A protein has these predicted regions:
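Structural signal for well-ordered, non-membrane alpha-helices
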Residues: 31-42, 68-71, 75, 112-126, ...
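Acidic/histidine-rich alpha-helical segments that form the ligand environment
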Residues: 25-31, 36-37, 94-132, 152
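Short coil/turn linker and secondary-structure boundary residues
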Residues: 15-18, 41, 54, 99-102, ...
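Compositionally biased, intrinsically disordered low-complexity regions enriched in proline and serine
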Residues: 8, 12-14, 21, 100, ...
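Amphipathic, non-membrane alpha-helical segments in soluble helical-bundle scaffolds
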Residues: 17-27, 57-60, 101-108, 145-149
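Short, contiguous, helix-prone interaction/anchoring segments in small proteins
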Residues: 19-52
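Charged, low-complexity, helix-prone segments enriched in Lys/Glu/Asp/Gln
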Residues: 20, 92-95
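Short, contiguous alpha-helical
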Residues: 1-14, 45-90, 133-174
Length: 174
């Protein structure tokens, strides 16, 4: 069964504040999960593109590339912006980054570092900011910091599933 495309996914942001620390813990775990999945894979497996979609390295690099957006959206919440900054829906940064030329351990370490920074900033938000909301520009719906954490985690899971599918696909060809 084919998975739903990320941009077709609908979100219901109704988590209660008591779920916030659990979400942040899961967000912090994502780089470790990815590292466990990819660290022992051969280079040829890491860079292969299936159906002209991103390779494993490009999926990891994409998550790194998006941390700048997530960090900026924290700034938007702090500044009380009505609308959160938009993502580059064409993923130009990822498409131009040449992540396939990078060492996978460097990519996973970089992801771990930028994600730790994001989680640290999310933990530092005060109650006023945590209860505020801004409009997500693509979804056209209000988003609180806890909702952003949920959104980022679901995006992480989407790419973890993609990486698992790539590994399975390459292994079934061998």
């Amino acid at each position: 069964m084919e998975r739903k495309k990320w941009f077709d996914k609908k979100f219901q942001f109704d988590l209660t504040p008591d779920k916030y620390s659990s979400l942040l813990k899961k967000l912090n775990e994502t780089p470790h999960t990815i590292s466990r999945l990819v660290s022992s894979l051969d280079e040829k497996v890491l860079i292969i593109r299936v159906n002209n979609r991103w390779s494993i390295k490009e999926n990891v690099g994409h998550l790194i590339d998006l941390e700048e957006l997530h960090d900026g959206r924290i700034d938007d919440f702090i500044a009380g912006k009505e609308i959160l900054r938009p993502a580059d829906l064409n993923n130009q940064k990822t498409n131009e980054a040449n992540h396939n030329s990078k060492n996978i351990n460097d990519l996973t370490e970089r992801f771990k570092n930028v994600r730790e920074n994001f989680v640290k900033r999310m933990k530092s938000l005060d109650v006023k900011i945590l209860s505020s909301s801004s409009i997500h520009p693509r979804l056209k719906q209000p988003m609180r910091p806890i909702d952003m954490a949920q959104f980022v985690l679901e995006h992480d899971e989407h790419h973890i599933d993609t990486i698992k599918e790539l590994i399975k696909s390459v292994n079934s060809e061998n």
